[in-house]
Amino acid sequence: MTRRYWNINLEEMLEAGVHFGHGTRKWNPRMAPYISAKRKGIHITNLTRTARSLSEACDLVFDAASRGKHFLIVGTKDKAADSVASAAIRARCHYVNKKWLGGMLTNWFTTETRLHKFRDLRAEQKTGRLNRLPKRDAAMLKRKLSHLQAYLGGIKYMTGLPDIVIIIDQQEEYTAIRECATLGIPTICLIDTNCDPDLADIPIPANDDAIASIRLILNKLVSAICEGRSSYIRNH
């Protein structure tokens, strides 16, 4: 894998609060190598380690995108949801930002069945067929469509398992991480000072609670994906 330059700036990360961890009482001792200091009862993340991990992750996603691989971005908590959707749409990635439905990957057959139902209902709505049904039936199907849009809208074009999964909050998305581990799907995880770096293939030590921090990390990753996709298009 070729190392590239991704313009990862320590000052920019400081401004975004990437270095702020959790209170020292909440820390995970396995995060010790990624922590540089304690300040006012809070652990401070070593941004040099963050930059190194982020650069490695950008190299990985660029390389994967340049070979036509598919990505899934997962972040369901309120502070991450909007950033996840906009980053994924920009880089044409699949995303989950509402709720991780257990078995979404490990029980792919069921997920695929739901996606087929979702696509059928969307098609019926677009053609106006739903409006020609009895009011009660139409209302029930519209509620069903709204529910599917909320939970599966970000993966509606997914036709198989992703090649790489990017996860914003390790503790919040523990089920997703376990499913990826079961299936052998590589994960890139933002890990705050209360997380376990050993659960991710590429852990990126960073503040996973601040919107600015989440957005900065995602922007770097999707920029690398977009560059990789451009390379893939040029060569095919």
From Swiss-Prot:
Source organism superkingdom: Eukaryota
Pfam family, one: Ribosomal_S2
A GO cellular-component term linked to this record: mitochondrial small ribosomal subunit
MF GO annotations: structural constituent of ribosome
One of the protein's GO biological processes: translation
Covalent S-S links between cysteines: none
Subcellular compartments: Plastid, Chloroplast
PANTHER family: 30S RIBOSOMAL PROTEIN S2 PROKARYOTIC AND ORGANELLAR, SMALL RIBOSOMAL SUBUNIT PROTEIN US2M
Membership in a protein family: Belongs to the universal ribosomal protein uS2 family.
Protein name (Swiss-Prot/TrEMBL): Small ribosomal subunit protein uS2c
Source species of the chain: Illicium oligandrum (Star anise)
Gene: rps2
